[in-house]
Amino acid sequence: MARRTRNRSEIIARRFVSRQQPTRTQPFVERWRWIIQGQVQGVGFRASCSRRALDMGLKGWVRNLQDGSVEVQAEGPPIALAELRAWCEKGPLGAQVKRVKPCQMPVRGDDWFEVRY
């Protein structure tokens, strides 16, 4: 009986790993959360970030936080995510970004990118 359980565990593990690996029809996807600190509210950060993310084909959302920072959660190909993070480090004209705190998150499968209020 222990052998059957081990084989079943191996099968489940292989199925999980195969779902996480990119295929030719489905590119590798990651999800990242960034907290952007500095003078980032009242300068059009959310709208600009949303346009950039949509142009790059990313999914997720952006919102203001009560402490004056902005939170971005985005998922998509790692190259596009790196481009969005680089943009977040500068922000739109008028923003003064002091710090970007990154955190990798589990992929959720969002359907679009939106501004949250």
UniProtKB/Swiss-Prot annotation:
Q: List the GO molecular function terms.
A: acylphosphatase activity
Any idea where the Acylphosphatase-like domain is?
A: 31-117
Catalysed reactions listed for this entry: an acyl phosphate + H2O = a carboxylate + phosphate + H(+)
**Enzyme class at the top of the EC tree:** hydrolase
Which segment of the chain is annotated as a signal peptide? Answer: none
Identify which residues the record assigns to the active site.
46, 64
Q: Which Pfam families match?
A: Acylphosphatase
Q: What's in the keyword line of the UniProt record? A: Hydrolase
State its Enzyme Commission number(s).
Answer: 3.6.1.7
* Matches recorded under PANTHER family: ACYLPHOSPHATASE
- What family is reported? Belongs to the acylphosphatase family.
Name listed for the protein in its UniProt record = Acylphosphatase
Which lineage is the organism of this entry classified under, starting from the top rank?
Answer: Bacteria, Bacillati, Cyanobacteriota, Cyanophyceae, Synechococcales
